[in-house]
Amino acid sequence: MGCVQSFRNFCDRPKNTNVRISLPAVCFVWQIAMIILFGVFIRYNEEADTHWVEYRKKENISSDIENDFYFRYPSFQDVHVMIFVGFGFLMTFLKRYSFGAVGFNFLIAAFGLQWALLMQGWFHSLDYTDGKIKIGIENLINADFCVAGCLIAYGAVLGKVSPVQLMVLTLFGITLFAVEEYIILNLIHARDAGGSMVIHTFGGYYGLSISWMLYRPNLEQSSNLQGSVYQSDVFAMIGTLFLWMFWPSFNSAITDHGDGQHRAAINTYLALASTVLTTVAISSLFQKHGKLDMVHIQNSTLAGGVAVGTAAEFMLMPYGSLIVGFCCGIISTLGYIYLTPFMEKYLKIQDTCGIHNLHAMPGLIGGIVGAITAAAATESVYGKEGLVNTFDFVGPFKNMVPTTQGGHQAAGLCVAICFGIGGGIMVGCILRLPIWCDPADDNCFNDEPYWELPEEEEIIPPILHYNNHMVNKDV
């Protein structure tokens, strides 16, 4: 007990937010490390290399149009916008933390995608003949997916950590993501086209576990900044709309060409539409005088896209997608109303953006839906070849049957949860050390410690409880 108390006392020393040495050092050293590692390991794959002409002749490819770039790049554009614009602006709801929301999102995404190309490359794209990682357009999409898990985790600690801590969070988050992704997709052989398990469940519980480890008992000292103003909510809604519009591309980006990709886009499109209506209904129903809460519209309207991710390429059927979206809109909105304050009060989890309701819970639902849909698959619905193609029943898995695949899907979900919680606790212990220049409790949710701000400041109105973005909250 004495050692534990000594560690706590060491971690609770006075805060110093001056990152003039630590942030440049981390950025320079890690970027130089990326340059060296890329020089040693990373090369273009055959479709991006100048030897494409020879490869085309060898494989009897008739036209450059058959290069994977032309199939994947539109989806890559959409996913890239989601990562840098969608996630960034979604987190600008805090009245005095918009620079940090967009700027630090930009920073960790730019670093994370480089590290992700290496980590995922070592697991998936390593050419054992020459020891090089061969990258193409699909690797760029997967790197963005990898980064998404860390951006989700950032939402739980938004406004409470320093940029140096975020870089550390991203370094470990990308590493853990690459390992759990390899275990789930390659060893367990689960299917997860839209990343309900691999991205959202992992990222959600990774962030929540870190937030639990970094619990601040005196965070109410910054309560006047822990909310939104009219303009900041409008900017956050821009992020919502970008995410909502491009989510079908997110869930279908790396599925097989043809029917799988087509089906994934349709299922996501319908689930998202259904979620909007139930979110509005529940938000109005549970608010006094039936007024809508902007936090629900910004976040819960996206939950259907998260939940349909795993089963997006399965024969979920259009009505099934609507049902998934319908349920997620209800569960996510009720989570913001009841679960977020409960978790802060009783579980000591301070979830700034409510990622438990937007990512973690819908990710769990998505994993369960995927397991049930896979187990219920039949040859009469999919066709013999369609069943093999959809679930990749080839090679060592050629004798698998749908019921077994359902069990593998459930196992993949458990792995994602374990990696998220276990990894988050481990990284949270590291981030508790008083060497990262994080803000004091009375200086959270504020851009001032890390950004040069305009001289004229708006008058800050009195604010809110938890993260529900409202000045006067009557429930």
From Swiss-Prot:
GO BP annotations, alphabetical order: ammonium homeostasis
Record's bilayer topology term: Multi-pass membrane protein
Glycosylation sites: 60
Residues in compartment: Extracellular: 42-73, 120-138, 189-193, 255-265, 321, 379-410
Chain ranges on the Cytoplasmic side, renumbered to this chain: 1-20, 95-98, 160-167, 215-233, 287-299, 343-357, 432-475
Regions crossing the membrane: 21-41, 74-94, 99-119, 139-159, 168-188, 194-214, 234-254, 266-286, 300-320, 322-342, 358-378, 411-431
Main location: membrane
UniProt xrefs under InterPro entries: Ammonium/urea_transptr, NH4_transpt_AmtB-like_dom, RhesusRHD
Record bears the keyword Translocase: no
GO cellular component: apical plasma membrane
Compartments it resides in: Apical cell membrane
One Pfam family of this chain: Ammonium_transp
Alphabetized GO MF terms: ammonium channel activity
Keywords (A to Z) from UniProt: Ammonia transport, Cell membrane, Glycoprotein, Membrane, Transmembrane, Transmembrane helix, Transport
Functional description taken from the UniProt entry: Functions as an ammonia transporter. May play a role in the elimination of ammonia in the gill.
Quaternary state and interactors: Homotrimer.
Record-stated family: Belongs to the ammonium transporter (TC 2.A.49) family. Rh subfamily.
Protein name: Ammonium transporter Rh type C
Native organism: Tetraodon nigroviridis (Spotted green pufferfish)
Phylogenetic lineage: Eukaryota, Metazoa, Chordata, Craniata, Vertebrata
